[in-house]
Amino acid sequence: MKLTGLFKRGAACLCTAAILMSGISAFALSPALPDEPAPAELSVTNAVSEAQLRSALSQLTVTYDSEAEGWQIDSPYEDASMQKSSCGVYPYLFITNDDPTVYISLGMSYFGNKKLDMKSVRVETEDNYYDFTCDDQFTGGYDNDLKSWFDYELFDMDDSTSWLNEWLAAKSVTATFTGKDGSTKTYTLTKDNLQAIRDILNAYDTLLGSDVSTARVVLRSLVK
């Protein structure tokens, strides 16, 4: 196996407790900072029809963040996963009002019967592994309703989607959460988790083939 990527935690506007108590719609991504590598942008030509874009986004949840002034696109599979106290590895898309850039980020959630303050996460296939270095700040806690400990980290992907496609092609994908105390928990990505990644990547590619005006019309109509 070879080391194919080392990622640091990205900035995000999040409250993990709010996510757990109110669903994923309570979560909002922050756009990447200006000095970061520029993510992909919406097309200047209308190569994708409104119907095609609407179809690609219909499997996902679209919410508008008035503070960040943009649309967040995520999978309902993540909310269902959290309600079952299941670990997960889920991507998100974010598009601002005044910028054609499509930002993609990856959220990783730990659930378990013991507190685990995440230090790192290793995602592994039969051929490669990807190490993610977590922030020093503990954003988790104990959820009384779910009766489970949780922690959450969000990573900027800087337009790197090739390894997500590798995960989809792999026979099995595991994520090993390692705590600052050395404790670990290994999670095998479920069929629903992989489908969420597939749906987000499909929406991402379709958005990149859409013009700005069409994308905004469709996003506004799908806001929940």
Identify the residue ranges that each predicted region occupies.
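Helix-centric, low-specificity signal for extended rod-like, repetitive segments
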Residues: 1-2, 47
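Bacterial N-terminal signal peptides that target proteins for export
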Residues: 3-14
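A generic "folded-domain core" signal
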Residues: 13, 27-224
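Hydrophobic core
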Residues: 15-22
